[in-house]
């Protein structure tokens, strides 16, 4: 059973600013990940400094990074932000 993806209004605004081809790829990658939670295929990793009680994850999609929570008990992926990768590892 696939996970539901929650995208808050703030993140929708971020997506609207991204060129359409990249935004489509990001959303396709999110939907693919939600179907099977295949961490390796979609290059999903836990963010290093995230708390153990509510770990954050990041997904690489081209030059963009998607930050999100996975709420396993509710089968929900809640997107926090979508940003373009800078030269450093600062999100």
Model-derived features: where do they sit?
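Intrinsic disorder/low-structure terminal segments
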Residues: 21, 32, 56, 67-68
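Enriched for short, Lys/Arg-rich terminal
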Residues: 2-4, 9, 13-17, 24, ...
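A short, well-structured alpha-helix characteristic of acyl/acetyltransferase catalytic modules
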Residues: 23-25, 29
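A short, ordered amphipathic alpha-helix with a cationic face
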Residues: 1-2, 33
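A short, surface-exposed loop/turn module that caps and links secondary-structure elements
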Residues: 32-58
């Amino acid at each position: 059973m696939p996970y539901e993806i929650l995208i808050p209004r703030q993140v929708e605004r971020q997506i609207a600013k991204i060129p359409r081809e990249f935004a489509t790829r990001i959303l396709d990658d999110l939907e693919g990940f939600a179907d099977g939670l295949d961490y390796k295929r979609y290059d999903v990793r836990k963010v290093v400094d995230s708390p153990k009680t509510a770990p954050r994850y990041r997904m690489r999609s081209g030059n963009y990074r998607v930050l999100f929570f996975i709420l396993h008990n509710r089968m929900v992926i809640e997107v926090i932000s979508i940003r373009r990768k800078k030269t450093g590892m600062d999100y």
